[in-house]
Amino acid sequence: MVEDELALFDKSINEFWNKFKSTDTSCQMAGLRDTYKDSIKAFAEKLSVKLKEEERMVEMFLEYQNQISRQNKLIQEKKDNLLKLIAEVKGKKQELEVLTANIQDLKEEYSRKKETISTANKANAERLKRLQKSADLYKDRLGLEIRKIYGEKLQFIFTNIDPKNPESPFMFSLHLNEARDYEVSDSAPHLEGLAEFQENVRKTNNFSAFLANVRKAFTATVYN
């Protein structure tokens, strides 16, 4: 180190000074002077080498610091990018969870509606079955014919009511409304009590009695 060289130089100066004080002749003085110059020159050369080594060490240290700084910067950038990626993944995960929940809700709603429709279809099929049974019964006994017409309506046609004209038709239309209740319309000839008959069949669900009452009402129009 430079401090060691300076200490060595101080030691050389002290030795030279001690020799100088004990020297009397001019020849010896000249020899000491040359020795002193050589010592100074050698020390200067060693000091120069040491200083260059110290400068090189400082440069290497600074370069090492710069490398560490660059590495730290790269590490921080990678860390920031990783945190950003993690945040994006979490966001996508939350979106996926919301989407999955929405899909599940839609599936459950579809299942409920499907069940409701299935139940309604079964109820309608049962009603139509009862209607067909009643129709078959009344077709033979009361001359009743049932036709399916526009708008999902059924048309009921009675014959054998007018003794003077047995083939003369007496008819009305029937369908199920949005509330799945019977709704009667388009009677020919017009019946005043049709609305009352409709209300009764909605309450009792006795369709056979409904048809019998309508036929009686049509028969009454013939004799009135």
Swiss-Prot record:
InterPro entries: Spc25, Spc25_C
Ranges for region Interaction with the NDC80-NUF2 subcomplex: 1-56
UniProt keywords, alphabetically: Cell cycle, Cell division, Centromere, Chromosome, Coiled coil, Kinetochore, Mitosis, Nucleus, Phosphoprotein
Region spans: Interaction with the C-terminus of SPBC24: 145-224
One Gene Ontology biological process: chromosome segregation
Domain of life: Eukaryota
Region (Interaction with the N-terminus of SPBC24): 1-144
Primary localization: nucleus
Coiled coil residues, start to end: 61-142
One Gene Ontology cellular component annotation held by this UniProt entry: kinetochore
Modified residues (Phosphoserine): 12
Cell compartments where the protein resides: Nucleus; Chromosome, Centromere, Kinetochore
KW Lipoprotein (keyword) present: no
Job of this protein: Acts as a component of the essential kinetochore-associated NDC80 complex, which is required for chromosome segregation and spindle checkpoint activity. Required for kinetochore integrity and the organization of stable microtubule binding sites in the outer plate of the kinetochore. The NDC80 complex synergistically enhances the affinity of the SKA1 complex for microtubules and may allow the NDC80 complex to track depolymerizing microtubules.
Assembly and oligomerization: Component of the NDC80 complex, which consists of NDC80/HEC1, CDCA1, SPBC24 and SPBC25. The NDC80 complex is formed by two subcomplexes composed of NDC80/HEC1-CDCA1 and SPBC24-SPBC25. Each subcomplex is formed by parallel interactions through the coiled-coil domains of individual subunits. Formation of a tetrameric complex is mediated by interactions between the C-terminal regions of both subunits of the NDC80/HEC1-CDCA1 subcomplex and the N-terminal regions of both subunits of the SPBC24-SPBC25 complex.
Similarity comment text for this entry: Belongs to the SPC25 family.
Protein name from the UniProt record: Kinetochore protein Spc25
Name of the encoding gene: SPC25
